[in-house]
Swiss-Prot record:
Species assigned in the record: Methanococcus maripaludis (strain C7 / ATCC BAA-1331)
Gene name tied to this protein: metG
Family membership: Belongs to the class-I aminoacyl-tRNA synthetase family. MetG type 1 subfamily.
Designated name of the protein: Methionine--tRNA ligase
Motif 'HIGH' region boundaries: 10-20
Classification via HAMAP family: Met_tRNA_synth_type1
Catalytic reaction annotation: tRNA(Met) + L-methionine + ATP = L-methionyl-tRNA(Met) + AMP + diphosphate
Taxonomic lineage from the root: Archaea, Methanobacteriati, Methanobacteriota, Methanomada group, Methanococci
Cofactor binding: number and manner: Binds 1 zinc ion per subunit.
PROSITE patterns referenced in this protein's UniProt entry, alphabetically: TRBD
Length: 663
């Protein structure tokens, strides 16, 4: 049987943290490595998700293009995965020709099969910016906890929100209150799939039970799915000029488009009637429904595609028993971890700490304890003492007649064989914790055997060879089974044994072994704790210093004169005015500030004709961070007063030269 293993597409709006590694990438890599170890044909598919509003927001804040953000974090994410020894056969990106073409083919086929239809919806619209606002472009007050919230989520209480639920909503670009307008979106008729999806889930024997239960609950109340968005950055909807495909309809198609990068063999893994293959999706718990309901619904709607056999859903990770938060820097980034510890230690800790489907915690103290008292004191102890003693006594692994082994020897070798079978079953069931526990138990048996045989006291050379041969057999089994979990450390063990990654003991000359498993020191842990607290305090300081946004109709907080002095207000003169393409409200203005000229985008269209603005002296905020409105960069802001529909530029009552400072 062929295997296709996929990992959730990493979102290119930041690097990877430990939560990503635990839920998705490490377990998928362990599973893939194990299948390869057993000689099975497997393709591991990964990549990055490059579209959606968070990326456009980051780009606007930094004054760059979305593709610049995508390129930066695609490369950073791949570097993080490489540092974790997570390897792929193909690693793609959704902002690529092959993906856009494949996604549009899927969409067109869904439409052709009658699963796409148009429907009017209500959506926030900003008059000043002349644009419909996606959920992340609206912020306001959470109606449940009264905390600051985004249009899709409240960070304070954790609730999912609709933008229209917000109290005092405002556009994040201009702070004005948006209005609700009707617009046409495209919907996927997912409700028509209810019976088909229920049958699929109920008849998927390899689907984990917790995933089945979650999917079946959703299927009971299945609704059609809005699959279009009024933004520019994304996969264009075929035949539509002003909307793109919602990321959750196009991103999973990346599993197909990225496999296509391997050439014609992609059909063997994805298309029906092309042979026996198994598809396993490794994801985080928060996107279980997307992969167990929405994605299979798309595949059923297309027709002719194989269905996922298993959606392997990893639980949430907390940090020191608190929810991780990237905005508060309460997070451990993969890069920071790898700069201080072996990636194998992280792979071990995450897989032994809890079953994959359960939520778990990362604590620096627990990490130190499990590495030092479990991995090193049990596995490290057996591997090191076996290698050191054998190399010192014989220089190579002894080979003996297995018929001469005594019962105690045969018992340990039998334990090796039963562990091999048990681990095989557990890994194929995605039960990585119990599989790793079996390896630890085998190492415990090895330590007990070594201690019981007391090879240092054996005078008979032949008997000593039998004992160390038996220990070497157990060591080979441990290395073989542990190699998928800890590829770096097991590669070093094989190097010292001068052996291949298999179960055969060849009697090769040994290299003088060094300590492979080094303990995590108290100083290491103290340093990491201090770094975490320092990063959190830095984030808190930034939050405190950040000026509060003023919403329409609200009074401003009282500020002191020093705070006001941070605003660079100057007299400017408008030189040129032209309309912003496809905008009903915006002008692109070139203003003279005396020592330089600035381009400013302002929502004065409708309030002033372009000709009457030319030559006017105005007041300009000059030290605002550049922002893009309708794709045009604005390098400042004109001051104006507004009352309902009346807009008036602030003017001087005496003539002053351009560039004059306002105090």
């Amino acid at each position: 049987m062929k295997h296709l293993v996929t990992t959730a597409l990493a979102y290119t709006n930041g690097p990877l943290h430990l939560g990503h590694a635990r839920s998705t990438y490490i377990p998928a890599d362990i599973y893939t490595r194990y299948l390869r170890l057993k000689g099975e044909e497997v393709v591991h598919v990964g990549g990055t998700d490059n579209h959606g509003v968070p990326i456009t927001l980051t780009a606007e804040r930094e004054g760059v293009k979305p593709i610049d953000i995508v390129d930066r974090y695609h490369n950073a994410i791949k570097a993080d995965l490489d540092s974790l020894n997570v390897s792929f056969d193909t690693f793609g990106r959704t902002h690529s020709d092959i993906h856009i073409e494949t996604a549009q083919e899927f969409y067109s086929k869904l439409k052709e099969n009658g699963y796409i239809y148009e429907k009017e919806i209500e959506q926030f619209y900003c008059e000043k910016c002349d644009m419909y606002l996606a959920d992340r472009y609206v912020e306001g007050i959470c109606p449940f906890c009264e905390g600051e919230a985004r249009g899709d989520h409240c960070e304070v209480c954790g609730r999912h929100l609709e933008p229209t639920e917000l109290v005092n909503p405002y556009c994040i670009h201009c702070n004005s209150k948006p209005e609700i307008k009707r617009t046409t979106h495209y919907f996927f008729k997912l409700s028509a799939m209810q019976d088909v999806l229920k049958e699929y889930i109920e008849n998927s024997p390899e689907m984990p039970e917790h995933v089945k239960n979650m999917a079946l609950r959703w299927i009971e109340e299945l609704h059609d799915w809005d699959v279009s968005r009024n933004i520019k950055w994304g996969v264009p909807i075929p035949g539509c000029d002003d909307q793109v495909m919602y990321v959750w309809i196009e991103a999973p198609i990346g599993y197909v488009s990225f496999t296509k990068q391997l050439g014609g063999i992609w059909e063997d893994y994805w298309l029906e009637n092309t042979g026996d293959s198994k598809i396993s999706h490794f994801i985080g718990k928060d996107i279980t429904v997307h992969h167990a309901v929405f994605w299979p619904g798309i595949l059923k709607g297309i027709g002719g595609y194989k269905m996922p056999n298993a959606v392997v859903s990893g639980g949430y990770l907390t940090l020191e028993n608190k929810k991780m938060s990237t905005s508060k820097n309460w997070v451990v980034w993969v890069k920071d971890f790898i700069e201080n510890f072996s990636s194998d230690y992280l792979r071990y800790f995450f897989m032994i700490n809890a079953p994959l489907n359960r939520d778990t915690d990362f604590s620096w103290d627990d990490f130190q304890k499990r590495i030092n008292t479990e991995l090193i004191d049990i596995i490290g102890n057996f591997t090191h003492r076996t290698l050191v003693f054998t190399e010192r006594k014989f220089g190579s692994t002894p080979i003996v007649d297995s018929n001469q082994l005594i019962d105690e020897d045969k018992k340990l070798i039998s334990k090796c064989e039963s562990t091999l079978n048990r681990v095989d079953s557990l890994i194929r069931e995605y039960n990585f914790k119990d599989a790793l526990m079996e390896i630890i138990l085998l190492a415990k048996e090895g330590n007990a055997y070594f201690q019981g045989m007391a090879p240092w006291a054996i005078k008979d050379d032949e008997r000593l060879k039998e004992v160390m041969y038996t220990c070497s057999v157990a060591l080979k089994y441990i290395i073989y089974l542990l190699s998928s979990f800890m590829p770096e450390k097991t590669a070093l063990l094989l190097e010292y044994m001068n052996e291949e990654l298999d179960l055969e003991v060849r009697g090769n000359p040994l290299k003088k072994p060094k300590v492979i498993f080094t303990k995590v020191s108290d100083e290491d842990i103290s340093r990491m704790k201090e770094n975490l607290l320092a990063a959190t305090k830095k984030a808190e300081t930034k939050t405190d210093e950040k000026s509060k946004k003023v919403k329409s109709g609200e009074k401003m907080d009282i500020i002191d004169i020093d705070y006001f002095g941070n605003v660079d207000l100057r007299v400017g003169q408008i030189l040129e005015v032209e309309e912003v393409p496809r905008s009903k409200k915006l002008y692109k203005i070139i203003a003279d500030l005396g020592d330089e000229k600035r381009q400013i985008v302002s929502g004065l269209k409708g309030a002033y004709e372009a000709e009457e603005l030319v030559g006017k002296k105005v007041i300009i905020i000059c030290n605002l961070k550049p922002a893009k409105l309708c794709g045009v960069e604005s390098q400042g802001m004109l001051l104006a007063a507004e009352d309902d529909s009346i807009v008036s530029l602030l003017a001087l009552d005496r003539d002053l030269p351009v560039g004059s400072k306002i105090h």
